[in-house]
Amino acid sequence: GLQPTSPPIDVMLMIAAVISAASCMQAAGGLDYMVKLAERLLRKNPSQVTILSPIVTYLFTFVAGTGHVAYSVLPVIAEVATETKIRPERPLGIAVIASQQAITASPISAATVALLGLLAGFDVTLFDILKITIPATIIGVLVGALFSMKVGKELADDPEYRKRLTEGYLDVKKVEIKDIHNKRHAVLSVLIFILATVFIVFFGSFDSLRPAFV
C-alpha cells in the first residue's frame, strides 16, 4: 500500500551524461589510444602479466565508469599470457574481476552515482565514498592477483594443453590493435575525460561548489 516514489531523474541524467562523454571519447579514438598504451605495457613486461592485467582493467573502468571498456584489452592479455607460457585463465580471471571492482570505486560509474543519491540525506559526500571504496578495491584486486599466480598447473606440466598443442588445436593469432588516425585528438579526448572526472569529484565532495536552487 505504499505510494511509489518519483523516478530518480537526477541519477538517470548523470548516467546519461557519463555515457555521452564516454561515447565522445570512443569516437575520437581515445579508447583505442588507451588500449595501445595497455598493450605496450603488457608486452614490455610479459612475465608480470598476471599482476599488470588487473591493474590495467581496473584503471580502464575507473576512468570510463563502465566495465565494458575492459573488453578491448582482454584479447591482448590472453595473447601475452600464452606467448609467455602462463595460463591465460590466471590474468584473464582476475582482470575481469578487477574491472567489476573498479565500478564501485569509479566516481562516474552508475553504481557510485546511485549510492551517492541514496546517501544524500546523511551528509555523505562523494569523497567519503571514494576514500573507502578505492583503497578497499585496490587491495582486494592486488591480493587476488597474487593468489591467481598459482591457479592451475603450469602449461608445461598440463597434459591436456600439451596434447592440444601437439594436435595443432592451439593456433594463437596475433591481435591487431586498431590504428589511431588522429593521435592528437585521441590523447586530447582522454585528457578532457580525465579532467572532467576530477571536476566531478570536487563538485561532489564540496557543497559550496555545487549550484543551489531556490
Regions found by a protein language model. Name each.
Residues 26-31, 63-66, 120-122, 201-209:
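Transmembrane helix-loop junctions in multi-pass membrane proteins
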Residues 49-53, 92, 189-192, 196:
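Hydrophobic alpha-helical transmembrane segments of polytopic
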Residues 10-11, 46-50, 129, 133, ...:
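Residue-level signature of transmembrane alpha-helical entry/exit and packing/kink sites
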Residues 2-84:
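Membrane-embedded alpha-helical segments and adjacent helix-loop junctions characteristic
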Residues 76-93, 204-213:
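Hydrophobic alpha-helical transmembrane segments and immediately flanking/interface helices
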Residues 47-51, 105-106, 111, 167-172:
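Small-residue-rich segments of transmembrane alpha-helices in multi-pass membrane proteins
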Residues 57-74, 88-128, 132, 137-151:
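Alpha-helical transmembrane segments and, especially, the helix-loop junctions at the ends
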Residues 131, 135-214:
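Long, contiguous bundles of hydrophobic transmembrane helices that form the permeation core
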